[in-house]
Design a protein with these regions (language model features):
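The feature captures the catalytic groove of carbohydrate-active enzymes
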Residues: 253, 258-263, 347-360, 408-459, ...
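Alpha-helical scaffolds flanking conserved acidic
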Residues: 322-326, 458-463, 619-623
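C-terminal capping/lid segments that line or modulate ligand- or cofactor-binding pockets
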Residues: 26-49, 53-54, 105, 359-382, ...
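Asparagine-centered strand-capping/turn motif at beta-strand->loop junctions
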Residues: 165, 739-743
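Aromatic-residue-lined binding/catalytic grooves and analogous aromatic/hydrophobic interfacial grooves
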Residues: 1-425, 446, 532, 539-575, ...
Length: 797
């Protein structure tokens, strides 16, 4: 049933389904700039083409100053008018006619391949090679095997598509390019709309040329060159007809934000210069593409299915197999590699709707799911274009802070208006959620810890954190009695305190823990970066004093972390949202992370997990599993991960946002969205199950789930650029750990539960078996330290 060579191949035996939303089940690939979504039909094949920079609709505006209304937020809180308090700024912005709209990714076009079929096809399959990104569709018609292969070249920035057969019956089909299908134009509210885009297609020599005019007046389109080996090719005004060819190669390039007359000629010339054949182009591309995939390895020894459809059936009927979880890790990396260019959209480069639901990236949590696994996966540099965009919008973020809250520093909205940093919506969930900047700061600081890129910190990173720190310095006020900070109003997404009217739905409260942990992270990072940059002593001291004023996190009467340091608002532990778990919820350990606090986090998250069935969406479960993995509770994380995969995986392994099948685990969503962030987030979960770090502190798993009997995690990158390889065998109770640092350093190592002994350490006195720790473990520059750790056997067979 299982072939080791197929480990990096996802094979399906059915084409995309889903009726008029078939694109949601397509097989996808791309190069970060262009992407294709292959529906996989034998007779009428549709391949949807997307470009990273093609958007439509959306508008910004001039953000008015409504900071004079902030005082009304506190007044309404004091009078228990919570809903009124939450909507103060929203109403003020609406009154001044600030009505921004987020834009939508716009599909460039569809490739249409119509093939005569003489009988019901047999031996059908479609597959993705995760190492190369190549998508294949294979079938037999009257005994003759037909093969179609496509990838998006990183070498030539070209879509490369080949059709061939290996029998007496040759390749025959019609090919054209069309405007993306408009029959399913619906919003999330099931409202129909007219697309009203002017598009045209024509043939020109060996080319099919498709062009369209966007709503901003710019042109977009696609130029495809058709190359036949044998057979007869004829053309009409808008399509090519190929009969009895040995093989056909189609090369295509797209353009956006251009003028079509000039761009079409340029692309025709570029396509004519590409050197064939297909295999040569694929080899050149794979050398570049595989670097995204092979930089880290997760190997989980298990029985496996070559057929993903069977693996999914088994998953739905029972539990996810270990091999499926391993493939989900690879698939997440594939989606990242195919989508990551200067930015990533929630729909990747695979969108098939004109107004795709939730297709605008959210800077809060979603962005971190898309990128944060890359820090440990040797892909840290991929986040730099994202940081550049945030830095370019710094002036807008300052306007946001001043005009909304009357504060210094910056405010980053979770949703941004097109081509700027202003809020993209005025709903309270965007306007009141002012902790987004701390999430970006966590990414910046994590990038620094894993790359030691001090030049970036000097030029951009420190200023960004400093501006965020200034916001919290202004926003938080010192209690004269306790000498610690208070916060008169805040927003804890997306939870309503448990002690209010059951019919009320709001997230505003005072002394929200998410405010304090966010400010604490920023102040702490500023202190550390101040030392690294040799900042003035008074400046470092200022941030340290602010850090010292952050109040301790409180625990409720049941022993779980409170969401509010308040006697007015009570924590709702029946909610699946965990904003007070920052930064663990995005896979990052703060510098002051302690095992006792991590135990509190694990217990709190697991309690919420047990009490929230029926309320989950896939994002909740992804964040819970990430949090548990980051604090070392790999067993708990694995349980949540299995629930996520079992209940939200669709037929092409994309995780749906909601429970559209109504199985009872999640909140029912009839119009669930296609988003790749949860798939990529799985990579973060699985990596963090094995090992985590916080500066010079390295933490191994407390215990691994019994299902992961044997395996390895190779070439993971920790803080201080330390590389780590792990091999584990639960039955034997053995963990082999290799650490390699680029410079002389010492680290502290937290050991697994049930620790017995360790080999490979020169000084046994640094081992504290009782507290499961090793202190002052020396690493010599560019030399591998090999350790063999023995722990209690956690499985019996």
């Amino acid at each position: 049933m299982y072939n080791k060579k197929s480990k990096n191949v996802l094979k399906f035996v059915t084409p995309a389904g889903g009726f008029d939303a078939r694109w949601r089940e397509g097989l996808v690939t791309g190069n970060g700039s262009m992407g294709v979504n292959v529906l996989g039909s034998a007779g009428r094949e549709v391949i949807i083409v997307n470009h990273a920079d093609l958007f439509w609709q959306g508008k910004a505006g001039v953000l008015p100053d409504v900071s004079d209304k902030v005082k009304n937020i506190v007044k309404n809180l004091d009078t228990l008018s919570y809903k009124d308090a939450e909507t103060v700024l929203t109403n003020a912005l609406n009154a001044k006619n600030y009505k921004p709209e987020c834009n939508y990714p716009l599909p460039v076009c569809d490739f249409l391949i119509t093939t005569p079929i003489e009988n019901s096809v047999t031996e059908y399959s479609r597959s993705i090679n995760l190492e190369s990104g190549e998508v294949k569709v294979n079938y037999r018609d009257r005994g003759v095997k037909f093969d179609r292969s496509i990838f998006v070249s990183r070498q030539n920035n070209t879509i490369v598509y080949e059709l061939s057969s290996n029998g007496s019956k040759k390749v025959s089909f019609d090919f054209t390019i069309s405007m993306h299908d408009t029959t399913n134009n619906r919003t999330a509210n099931f409202e129909n709309f007219d697309v009203n885009l002017n598009c045209s297609v024509k043939t020109d020599k060996d080319f099919v040329v498709f062009t369209g005019r966007n709503d901003d007046g710019t042109d977009f389109g696609c130029v495809a060159k058709v190359i036949c080996s044998g057979g007869v090719i004829t053309k009409t005004i808008d399509k090519f007809s190929i009969k009895n060819a040995d093989r056909v190669l189609i090369l295509a390039k797209t353009f956006v934000l251009s003028q079509k007359d000039k761009k079409v000629m340029e692309l025709q010339e570029e396509l004519s210069l590409i050197k064939l054949p297909y295999d040569k182009l694929l080899k050149e591309h794979t050398i570049l593409h595989s670097k995204f995939i092979n930089n880290t390895e997760i190997n989980l020894v298990s029985e496996a299915y070559d057929n993903i459809n069977l693996a999914l059936l088994n998953c739905k009927a029972n539990e996810p197999s270990v091999s499926l979880i391993e493939k989900m890790y690879m698939y997440g990396k594939h989606l990242f590699a195919c989508s990551c260019g200067n930015k990533i959209n929630p729909t990747g480069l695979f969108n098939g709707d004109y107004k795709a639901y939730r297709s605008t990236v959210e800077n809060y949590l979603q962005l971190q799911r898309l990128y944060n696994f890359g820090f440990k996966a040797s892909l840290s540099k991929q986040v730099l274009p994202l940081f550049d965009r945030f830095y370019e919008n710094l002036d807008d973020y300052k306007k946001n802070s001043t005009r909304l809250y009357g504060c210094k520093g910056i405010y980053i909205p979770s949703l941004e208006a097109p081509e700027c940093g202003l809020p993209g919506s005025t709903v309270p969930g965007v306007i009141m959620n002012y902790n987004v900047a701390s999430y970006i700061c966590a990414m910046i600081y994590q990038y620094y810890l894993q790359t030691d890129d001090i030049d970036f910190i000097k030029e951009k990173g420190y200023e960004f954190l400093e501006e965020t720190g200034l916001f919290y310095e202004d926003k938080l006020k010192e209690n004269k009695t306790t000498k610690t900070f208070e916060c008169a109003y805040g927003y804890s997404p997306f939870n309503t305190p448990s002690n209010v009217n059951a019919n009320e739905d709001f997230c505003i409260a005072s002394n929200c823990v998410c405010d304090f942990v966010s400010a604490s992270f920023v102040f702490s990072a500023l202190v550390q970066l101040g030392f690294a940059l040799n900042k003035d002593e008074k400046e470092v001291e200022k941030w340290q004093k602010l850090l010292d004023k952050i109040p301790d996190v409180e625990v409720d009467r049941d022993g779980y972390i409170k969401e509010y340091n308040s006697n007015v608002f009570e924590t709702n532990n029946a909610s699946p949202y965990i904003p007070h778990m920052f930064p663990y919820n995005i896979g990052i350990k703060p510098l002051d992370s302690r095992r006792d606090y991590e135990d509190l986090i694990a217990n709190t998250v697991k309690y919420r997990y047990k009490n929230c069935f029926g309320k989950f969406n896939s994002a909740n479960l992804c964040d819970m599993a990430t949090t548990l993995a980051t604090v070392g509770d790999s067993v708990g994380s694995y349980e949540v991960l299995c629930t996520l995969i079992k209940n939200f995986t669709t037929n092409n392994l994309i995780l749906s946002s909601g429970d559209n099948t109504g199985m009872g685990v999640g909140a029912y969503e009839p119009w669930t969205s296609f988003e790749i962030d949860k798939n990529i987030g799985i990579c973060n979960i699985i990596q963090n199950m094995f090992i985590n770090s916080s500066k010079n502190n390295i933490s191994l798993f407390r215990a691994l789930p019994k299902e992961l009997k044997k395996g390895s995690a190779l070439n993971l990158v920790l803080d201080n650029q330390i590389k780590a390889d792990l091999e584990f065998n639960l039955k034997k109770g053995v963990l082999k750990l290799k650490l390699k640092s680029p410079k002389n350093t010492s680290v502290n190592l937290n050991l697994p539960n049930g620790f017995k002994k360790i080999k490979g350490i020169a000084d046994p006195n640094i081992v504290d078996a009782k507290n499961l720790s090793i202190t002052g473990l020396s690493l010599q520059a560019n030399k591998i330290l090999s350790l063999k750790i023995y722990f209690a056997n956690t499985i019996n067979n």
